[in-house]
Amino acid sequence: MTVSILLDSLKDDGQRLSECRHESPFSILGPQPFKDKWIIRIWMPEASEVELITQQTKIKLQNPNHEWIFEGVLEKDPGNDYQIKVNRGGIEHVQHDPWSFRKEWMGEIDRHLFAEGNHHHIWRKMGAHLTEINKKQGVMFCLWAPHAKSVSVIGDLNSWDGRHHPMQKRLGGIWELFIPGLSEGDLYKYEIRTEKGHCYEKADPYGFQHEVRPAKSSVISKIDSFQWNDQSWISNRDNRDPLEQPISVYEMHLGSWMHASSDDPFINSNGEHRAPVPAADMKPGSRLLTYKELANKVIPYVKERGFTHIELMPISEHPFDGSWGYQVTGWYAPTSRFGSPDEFRAFVDSCHKEGIGIILDWVPGHFPKDQHGLAYFDGSHLYEHSDPRVGEHKEWGTLIFNYSRNEVRNFLVANLIFWFDQFHIDGIRVDAVASMLYKDYLRPEGEWIPNEDGGNENFEAVRFLQQANHVLFQHFPGALSIAEESTTWSGVTKPTDMDGLGFNLKWNMGWMHDMLDYFEIDPWFRQFNQNNITFSICYNFTENFMLALSHDEVVHGKSHLLHKMPGDDWQKYANTRALLAYMWTHPGKKTIFMGMEFGQRQEWNVWDDLQWDLLNYEPHKGIQKLVDDLNNLYKREPALWRNDFDEYGFQWIDCDDNKNSVISFMRREKTDGEWLVIVANFTPQNHSNYRIGVPVDGFYEEIFNTDASQYGGSNLGNMGGKSTDLYNIHGYENSIDLCLPPLSVLVLKHKSKKN
């Protein structure tokens, strides 16, 4: 039956559709009731003929109201059980009608939870989802853009023309459209038309995959299809207190750890060759390793070194390599530089198989201004504050999230849960927390707005961080949440129910700066700076601290760790060994940046890879061997980690020998009373008869010595250990007389009492 219904209103609708100004295509397109019949209207730009195909009939549709609105009349509601055959320029194809799939994807409860900021799994609704509706395979698109005039899906499916697939606006500023026939790997973006008539092409904020830079489109990708094999790991993790475990972290940047030749085969997890991703223009002939290649190389390397965790600098999709990953545009997608999301899942799964946890750097403090990203998303300051005194980091050239907006907080909190849920990560390190906590961070007077109490604290950011940590531990009780917080803000690692921020670890930035300042001093002048290496204990038990020597300390002219050290090469190596050993024996969990474990000489360069050729030289092998043995010692001796955050776990023997730059202390394990004695000599002068007090008589075995020849040292030591003498010193009746090698750290363990 072919009946044309002439409606003046449809001419206006057609005009608005053709100009991408229509926010409710479902009101006119698809099956529409008309008296006792049904009109089927199809929007098909640039089509010359459209035919409706049902199981019973075929109808050539007419376009009496607008050249691209085709319609016909049926006796009954066909639902979405029909197809349309389209002729464009003599080329025909058959498809299902997107506007016949009218059921709301985002339900009332979903909208309510999202609007109040409490939808912890919002990614299961937002974004592009491969799904089936009424036995029709396709993709459901769902986007939050409340101030947009219209939103269209664009991609290869419509030659990136926003006129073809306008989305339907729902309650709460949600836009939806189901497009049948799309499949995994298809590219798409959202074309957003603003109230002022401006048009933006935006990547999907909730996209699960994006193109390799410099391309910017989102990629349709499956979730929940990967077959995990780490159930035992996850169960064990979530049923123990991570703070009562040894934690030794290898911080790394996947793109600059190691490169491969562009001539080497570049093969994905399906065994398919694909175009290599260049490492950088400044390094022609090299390419990035894939997630699969990284798994094959990084995991055995880290396991051999003895680290318990890998911390990855941000791998959320980001357009600019030079940002190191800290300017994110694809929050719900691992970067495609190294492969697909499932290939990253396989990387994590392989880490867990080998007993290695994964920590990701997470950057909820700011985002870049890239046009395809979150900035000015729907023609309004949707994700950021509108006032630059609140919403912009001018020094960084980035924007600040509006933490007071529920939907924005929801975006971030759900993103945190997403990485644990979808990629089985074990922890996060939150970058630049201080920049979130203080409204005047890096701002001169007059360029920030005080809070309601007249102070500089950002209460909105505080509440966001508390919510994020509370929700994280609610879902994943064994997780690590680490704050990079560089000030003295109180309660960073206190639980949220005690008005803390809720992290369970905080980088000890003060320790890091004091240590590096101290070790850069000529050893003969260190006697005047003894406080640098002892002061950290004064505040050590106020927070749950992690000691970190991070990437920030080996860039921008600061030199790599080895080259910070004074003296000739021998002293540089010895100082490096001593610093690392002091770090491993000091209370607190551990993190070092890649390259430090073998004495990298050059500053870290994001465009280059590490100086692996240095391992051809014995001193660098020695540092690597030292780190291996430190990690093994650390994991083997509970006194070095079980009591990190309790004053009982640490006791000075002597911290006042400034003249010799020597310190001595004990680490104690609370369950069986075992303890270790640590003695550090931070000058090149060895001491052949250096006496320290000890709490119990007997034999003290020397279980570690940074001056051992296997590490590149001079091999001075104590012939395996020393027995005590009844000689009162440092408040103890018993003492041992030690040989202290130059620039060294000794670890001794009480073995037996005298008869």
Swiss-Prot record:
It catalyses: Transfers a segment of a (1->4)-alpha-D-glucan chain to a primary hydroxy group in a similar glucan chain. The active site is at 431 (nucleophile), 484 (proton donor). One of its GO terms (biological process) is glycogen biosynthetic process. One of its GO terms (molecular function) is cation binding. Keywords: Carbohydrate metabolism, Glycogen biosynthesis, Glycogen metabolism, Glycosyltransferase, Transferase. Its EC number is 2.4.1.18. InterPro entries: A-amylase/branching_C, Branching_enzy, GlgB, GlgB_N, GlgB_N_E_set_prok, Glyco_hydro_13_cat_dom, Glyco_hydro_13_N, Glyco_hydro_b. SUPFAM superfamilies: (Trans)glycosidases, E set domains, Glycosyl hydrolase domain. Signal peptide: none annotated. It comes from the Bacteria. One of its GO terms (cellular component) is cytosol. Pathway: Glycan biosynthesis; glycogen biosynthesis. Belongs to the glycosyl hydrolase 13 family. GlgB subfamily. Catalyzes the formation of the alpha-1,6-glucosidic linkages in glycogen by scission of a 1,4-alpha-linked oligosaccharide from growing alpha-1,4-glucan chains and the subsequent attachment of the oligosaccharide to the alpha-1,6 position. PANTHER family: 1,4-ALPHA-GLUCAN-BRANCHING ENZYME (PTHR43651:SF3). Monomer. This is 1,4-alpha-glucan branching enzyme GlgB. The gene is glgB.
